[in-house]
């Protein structure tokens, strides 16, 4: 069936940036051009959007699908002002949760409550001793558990990052590097169907946000479930295997032996943690903590061996690196791997790249390293007044997220959210990038949109099908109630997604 759609269309194709009409046949685009040209084409149906604007479907290059799905059913702690309110919100959630089932507290930032800390196991025990209880920091790094959860998970008190009191008893708080496998331990208590329902919740939210392609950063179990049940979902899924263990050769073998995953999976690991929790690895010490520099989760050699193995099998590789010291390590390792086994268009990635030095930006550009960055980290974590990071890294907060410098260096950047760390709101993210506190690092609306469409597609080797509206591409597009190029910057956040189409199928319509 052929459809012709008439609207103001921004194609994100620099050779043909706008169109007045777009032809859809089944799941792909067969025409873009003028109204006059379109009227000469015989179609089965015509749709007109005289007051709306059409863009390619957004692409989110960094989503933690399963924690997101589970957290969406948990207690939202983002607005809590003190520990008493945190515990009360958890009690309300426990009251509606069957005994023995997990109670999850999500979107928590200890720096935002009066006490500036996580609740300990005994405070969480006051909520319930008949439910395992788990609180996760908004950035997915520090955690806190009650006694029931600790008993189920079996943390070794000797493990670095498992917090104990003066008597050697677990406090319930888990920090890097011990938290690295905590989520995996928790997932084991959820059935496949539980996890798939979490995937569906994220998928539905993505459609409502205009996101038609998700790069899912999850465990092999989750990647396989998502691939085996892809007919249940609207968004296309680009698998990214996330592992903190750079010696997980069994996991790598499992990816290589799965035909579907072998062809499209990006291998992802971690160089450091996050500023919240003081675990991002920095060159200069943390503010007010002259002996603390964060941590590198792997040695150069460990990271090198893992990246080398991925390159040997022609797999894309990605490393989380937030602090300037961690970023330097990753660039150093990538340079070694790519020198030994060159590939012109490797698209090795660094995730976040929040506090790079000028030299790191220059070197990343020289090596052809691509970046997965999340604009809303500026608002949610750094703070529009920089206070969110200034408490950890002082004046260096003003050097975070240097988008202008990165794009001017010619580096490929794909936008994302790190959901659930930040919400799926691409147009709000554009506003934040255009108004960020470091004025010299602001970028244009077109650059913001490219990060979430054509450049995001290229980040995942999907540019032959995704990210632009032109003949031969997938019919992934969204209908907006206002033209983002015709409203004030501050109004970008208020633009609504009216409809979302994925591969030609209407998957969301605003009520």
Regions found by a protein language model. Name each.
Residues 2-5, 10, 14-25, 29-233, ...:
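Divalent metal-binding segments
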Residues 23, 269, 500:
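Short aromatic-centered micro-motifs
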Residues 146, 210, 273, 320, ...:
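Conserved, mostly hydrophobic/aromatic
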Residues 260-262, 363-372, 409-412:
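Glycine-enriched alpha-helix->loop->beta-strand junction motifs that scaffold or abut catalytic
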Residues 308-317, 325-348, 353, 373-485, ...:
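His/Asp/Glu-enriched, well-ordered alpha-helical/loop segment
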Residues 64, 264-279, 369-379:
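Non-cysteine beta-strand/loop elements that form the S-adenosyl-L-methionine
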Residues 227-261, 265-268, 356-362:
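Extended hydrophobic/aromatic segments used for targeting, binding, or gating
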Residues 497-511:
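Short peripheral tails and domain-boundary helices/loops at the edges of structured domains
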């Amino acid at each position: 069936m052929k459809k012709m759609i008439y609207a103001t269309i921004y194609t994100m194709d620099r050779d043909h940036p706008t169109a007045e009409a777009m032809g859809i046949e089944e799941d792909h685009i067969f025409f873009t051009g003028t109204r006059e040209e379109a009227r000469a084409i015989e179609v089965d149906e015509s749709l007109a959007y005289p007051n709306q604007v059409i863009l390619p479907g957004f692409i989110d290059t960094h989503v933690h699908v399963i924690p997101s799905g589970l957290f969406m059913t948990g207690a939202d702690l983002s607005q809590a002002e003190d520990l008493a309110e945190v515990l009360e919100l958890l009690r309300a959630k426990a009251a509606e949760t069957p005994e023995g089932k997990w109670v999850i507290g999500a979107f928590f930032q200890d720096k935002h409550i009066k006490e500036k800390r996580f609740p300990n196991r005994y405070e969480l025990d006051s909520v319930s001793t008949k439910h395992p209880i788990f609180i996760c920091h908004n950035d997915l790094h520090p955690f806190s558990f009650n006694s029931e959860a600790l008993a189920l998970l079996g943390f070794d008190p000797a493990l670095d990052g498992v917090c104990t009191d003066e008597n050697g008893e677990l406090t319930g708080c888990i920090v890097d590097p011990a938290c690295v496998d905590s989520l995996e331990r928790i997932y084991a208590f959820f059935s496949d169907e539980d996890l798939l329902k979490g995937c569906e919740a994220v998928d539905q939210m993505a459609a409502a946000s205009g996101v038609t392609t998700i790069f899912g950063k999850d465990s092999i179990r989750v990647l396989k479930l998502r691939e085996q049940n892809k007919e249940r979902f609207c968004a296309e899924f680009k698998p990214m295997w996330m592992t903190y263990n750079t010696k997980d050769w069994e996991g790598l073998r499992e990816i290589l032996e799965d035909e579907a995953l072998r062809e499209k999976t990006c291998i992802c690991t971690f160089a450091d943690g996050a500023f919240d929790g003081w675990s991002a690895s920095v060159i200069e010490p943390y503010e007010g903590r002259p002996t603390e520099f964060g941590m590198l989760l792997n040695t150069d050699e460990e990271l090198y061996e893992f990246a080398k193995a991925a390159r040997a099998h022609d797999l894309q590789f990605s490393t989380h690196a937030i602090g300037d010291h961690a970023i330097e390590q990753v660039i150093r390792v990538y340079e070694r791997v790519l020198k030994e086994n060159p590939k012109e268009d490797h698209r090795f990635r660094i995730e976040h790249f929040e506090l790079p030095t000028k030299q790191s930006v220059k070197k990343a550009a020289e090596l052809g390293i691509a970046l997965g960055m999340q604009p809303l980290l500026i608002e949610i974590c750094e703070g529009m007044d920089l206070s969110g990071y200034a408490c950890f890294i002082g004046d260096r907060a003003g050097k975070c997220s240097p988008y202008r410098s990165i794009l001017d260096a010619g580096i490929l950047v794909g936008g994302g959210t790190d959901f659930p760390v930040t919400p799926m709101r691409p147009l709000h993210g554009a506003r934040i990038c255009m108004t960020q506190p470091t004025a010299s690092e602001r970028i244009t609306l077109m650059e913001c949109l490219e990060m979430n469409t054509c450049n995001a597609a290229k980040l995942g080797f999907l540019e032959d099908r995704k990210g632009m509206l032109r003949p031969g591409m997938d019919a992934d597009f969204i209908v907006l109630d206002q033209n983002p190029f015709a409203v004030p910057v501050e109004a970008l956040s208020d633009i609504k997604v009216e409809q979302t189409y994925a591969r030609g199928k209407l998957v969301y319509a605003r009520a």
